[in-house]
Swiss-Prot record:
Domain of life where this protein originates: Bacteria
CDD domains, alphabetized: LuxR_C_like
Pfam family, one: GerE
Gene name in the database record: ecpR
Compartments (UniProt record): Cytoplasm
Any single Gene Ontology cellular-component annotation: cytoplasm
Keywords: Activator, Cytoplasm, DNA-binding, Transcription, Transcription regulation
Species, as recorded: Klebsiella pneumoniae (strain 342)
Protein name as annotated: HTH-type transcriptional regulator EcpR
InterPro entries: Sig_transdc_resp-reg_C-effctor, Tscrpt_reg_LuxR_C, WH-like_DNA-bd_sf
Domain HTH luxR-type: from-to ranges: 122-180
Length: 180
């Protein structure tokens, strides 16, 4: 997991050239809506693409990537299946904001809103993953079985399945599909 500096614009994941190209064009397109200079955005911001292909790495190693971007203004670009996780990281770390990529949303306005620092907790309309659900998601991503998770978390197997089911409802997908 590495992030990349392309023409001083930081993106994560480094291999996602389509994301970089699209994001670069979007930022140039909304230049008149942004209060900060292009140079400051390139220098101080990290844009993270939370898509289903990269979610496994972000879930398993969230403490690593969060410490790697310390001191930067982190903007999460969240697909529908990763909105609840993006909200969790927004609440539990130093994230500047979340841009929700939906079919009916104007991504340009949302991106400008976040870059300008106007994204607040009240802007989160979707569910967020709880701490217990996140622990269970992490352990599932590491390949642990519900019985082992229950023993570690000091709860019943039924409780593990309940938290897993609740997390899956918020993520619109089965956990094992996201962490493959």
């Amino acid at each position: 997991m590495e992030y990349k500096c392309c023409s001083d614009k930081y993106i994560w994941s480094a291999h996602d050239s389509y994301f970089y190209k699209g994001l670069s064009e979007l930022i140039l397109d909304i230049d008149e809506l942004i209060y900060l200079s292009q140079e400051k955005i390139r220098k101080d911001f990290v844009f993270i693409n939370l898509n289903t292909a990269s979610l496994n790495e972000f879930i398993r190693r969230d403490s690593e990537w969060l410490s790697a971007v310390k001191g930067k203004q982190v903007v999460l670009i969240a697909a529908r299946k990763s909105e609840a996780l993006a909200n969790y990281w927004y609440y539990n770390s130093n994230i500047r904001g979340v841009v929700y990529v939906g079919l009916s949303r104007d991504i340009r306005k949302e991106l400008a809103y976040v870059i300008n620092g106007r994204f607040l907790r009240k802007d989160i309309k979707k569910d967020k993953i709880t701490d217990r659900e996140m622990k269970i998601i992490r352990m599932t991503a590491q390949g642990m079985q519900p019985k082992s998770i229950a023993r570690i978390e000091n709860c019943s197997v039924k409780t593990v399945y309940t938290h897993r089911r609740n997390a899956e409802a918020k993520l619109y997908s089965k956990i094992y599909k996201l962490v493959q």
